[in-house]
Amino acid sequence: MEWKTCNFCGKSIEPGTGKKFVKKDGSVMFICSSKCEKNYKLKRVARKLRWTPIYYNNKHSNKK
């Protein structure tokens, strides 16, 4: 089994956990938790949320 990464926050998802979310256009998103799912449905941007690893990656890369 292969590990997936959450398309919202960027965390790795252990096999057998998480959700597969299929959009209307047929693209597939892997979601690690209900927290990520709710924020995605509210159309929030992960780069602006402090609890996501993507926020910290962008924050530190902009300082260089």
Curated annotation (Swiss-Prot):
Family under the similarity heading: Belongs to the eukaryotic ribosomal protein eL24 family.
The species this protein was found in: Methanococcus aeolicus (strain ATCC BAA-1280 / DSM 17508 / OCM 812 / Nankai-3)
Lineage per the UniProt record: Archaea, Methanobacteriati, Methanobacteriota, Methanomada group, Methanococci
SMART domains registered for this protein in UniProt: TRASH (SM00746)
PROSITE patterns reported in the protein's UniProt record: RIBOSOMAL_L24E
GO terms of biological process kind: translation
Keywords (A to Z) from UniProt: Metal-binding, Ribonucleoprotein, Ribosomal protein, RNA-binding, rRNA-binding, Zinc, Zinc-finger
Protein name, per record: Large ribosomal subunit protein eL24
Zn-finger region bounds: C4-type: 6-36
Pfam families reported in the protein's UniProt record: Ribosomal_L24e
Record SUPFAM superfamilies: Glucocorticoid receptor-like (DNA-binding domain)
Molecular function as annotated in GO: rRNA binding; structural constituent of ribosome; zinc ion binding
InterPro entries (alphabetical): L24e/L24_sf, Ribosomal_eL24, Ribosomal_eL24-rel_arc, Ribosomal_eL24-rel_N, Ribosomal_eL24_CS, TRASH_dom
Signal peptide: none
Gene responsible for this protein: rpl24e
Function: Binds to the 23S rRNA.
Cofactor comment: Binds 1 zinc ion per subunit.
Cofactor(s) annotated in UniProt: Zn(2+)
Domain of life: Archaea
